[in-house]
Amino acid sequence: MSVTMVRQKIKDGGLEEAEAAVRDLFATFDRVGLEGVRYASTRVVDSSTFVILFELAEGIEDPRMTIPEYPRFLERLKGWVDGSPVIEQLDVVGSYNLFGTQREESAVR
């Protein structure tokens, strides 16, 4: 399984608008449902840097672009960002209920 991590800084003065847009977008995702997607948008405390984690189940087409609000959000995002995003692929080594990993029951000895 692979998880994409995006770090993006937001311009001064755009933070509140960006946060509101993210909340609206995630409310839309909750309303319509995204099958096979795990997605979180977080902000580093006391900073204007967002960290986004995105996981797409194997064999699934990314459903975000089929929701009209998502491309509109991406277009608006262009006016808020400060610099290019840092995009990295992560290999999940361990996870407890965060990503789509199955926990194996360990035997108590």
Functional labels for PLM-detected ranges:
Residues A21-V22, E69:
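Hydrophobic alpha-helical membrane-association signature
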Residues L15-E17, E61-P63, Y96:
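Intrinsically disordered, low-complexity acidic/polar segments
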Residues K9-A20:
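Short, surface-exposed ligand-recognition loops at beta-strand->loop->(often short) alpha-helix junctions
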Residues K11-G13, A57-G59, G94:
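Short coil/turn motifs at secondary-structure junctions
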Residues V37-V51, L74-R109:
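Glycine-rich beta-strand-turn "strand-cap" elements at beta-sheet edges
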Residues S2-K9, V51-L53:
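Active-site-flanking beta-strand signature of metal-NTP-handling nucleotidyl enzymes
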Residues A27-V37, F54-Q89:
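An amphipathic, aromatic/His-enriched active-site/gating alpha helix that lines ligand/cofactor pockets
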